[in-house]
From Swiss-Prot:
Enzyme Commission code: 4.2.1.104
Protein name: Cyanate hydratase
Function: Catalyzes the reaction of cyanate with bicarbonate to produce ammonia and carbon dioxide.
GO terms of biological process kind: cyanate metabolic process
Pfam families, per the entry: Cyanate_lyase
Class in the EC hierarchy, top level: lyase
Source organism of the structure: Ajellomyces dermatitidis (strain ER-3 / ATCC MYA-2586)
PANTHER family in the cross-refs: CYANATE HYDRATASE
UniProt keyword annotation of Lyase present: yes
Length: 163
């Protein structure tokens, strides 16, 4: 795989990331592995795998063992870095400054109430879980050769309780 298409990390740009992020990204870059290939090796979704790298998802014991193997990181060291609970949401300033992340924020800002209205009509009064949740990213090319990002969010519907 070409180095040109690998997500890397400049830790100086992300002061709030955990120490594990620097270790994981360095090993990923050294081995020239994509999130897709790492995810396949550990049996996880590529977005979930990337979330572990950014300290936004909890790695299981099995994840840690497989990551240590595929990235050739000392298991005990990786376990010491990843055994705690993630401090989610802390790693990014708000609003985000990265253009792609800002566009995701902008989508929710512009269409959030429309999503809410349609979901309420389909499911009733409630919320879509970001805990019982999965997401995928696919690449689609149209007949004119234009590339499109297809992002799917799948969250369990949680109706509000009456009390």
């Amino acid at each position: 795989m070409s180095n040109l298409n690998l997500a890397t990390l400049d830790i100086s740009e992300h002061a709030n990331l955990p120490t594990s992020s620097e270790v994981l990204f360095k090993a990923k870059a050294d081995k020239k592995l994509s999130f897709e290939s790492i995810a396949a090796a550990i049996g996880r979704n590529e977005v979930a795998t990337a979330a572990i790298f950014y300290g936004q998802a909890k790695a299981s014991e099995e994840d840690i063992a497989k990551l240590a193997q595929v990235l050739e990181i000392d298991h005990a060291h990786l376990e010491s870095l990843l055994s705690g609970f993630p401090d989610r949401g802390k790693s990014v300033s708000f609003p985000p400054k990265d253009p792609l992340i800002y566009r995701l924020y902008e989508i929710v800002q512009n269409y959030g109430y429309a999503y809410k209205a349609v979901m309420n009509e389909k499911f009733g009064d409630g919320i879509m879980s970001a805990i019982s949740f999965s997401t995928t990213v696919e690449k689609e090319t149209d007949k004119d050769g234009n590339n499109w990002a297809v992002v799917t969010w799948r969250g369990k519907w949680l109706p509000y309780s009456r009390f």
